[in-house]
UniProtKB/Swiss-Prot annotation:
Signal peptide: none annotated. Residues 100-125 are annotated as: Disordered. The modification N-acetylalanine is found at residue 2. Binds 1 zinc ion per subunit. Its cofactor is Zn(2+). This is Protein ZNRD2.
Amino acid sequence: MALNGAEVDDFSWEPPTEAETKVLQARRERQDRISRLMGDYLLRGYRMLGETCADCGTILLQDKQRKIYCVACQELDSDVDKDNPALNAQAALSQAREHQLASASELPLGSRPAPQPPVPRPEHCEGAAAGLKAAQGPPAPAVPPNTDVMACTQTALLQKLTWASAELGSSTSLETSIQLCGLIRACAEALRSLQQLQH
């Protein structure tokens, strides 16, 4: 399959760095805690809604008095979490940028590779969402983005978004629903970043 003239080498897979692995592990542990808490609330009579929290993307619950409840925002998140790169994508991106700047300053000018935006890795839904979040980092390209690549990427993201939305509608698994919500949010954020690049 031709990729609009792009080299296949441009899309080669690289294993996650130690920092990325720690971030993924922390996210996995956080999702597990959210799932356990949601299970406890469901056993207490709470209902799972077909909506997600606008702040964190977690599936919302409703108690018998019809009060809306977000397990992640109201039980897990705190001010400390906002600075934790394992729980906050912005903090993780900032830490990754600091690490890249520190490693780039150690290299002599002649041996410094040209900066390339990270490419999302096809992984489990949660990993794919994390890869998409990492791919939307703010470094502006030195040249205008290739419109063919942008269009191809936008089409792929829209297809993935449509697929995830359809799957979410038919999903009966709490864990799958949580992961699909994360994927939908990551696709939407990536599409927003693409639109910003085009303007």
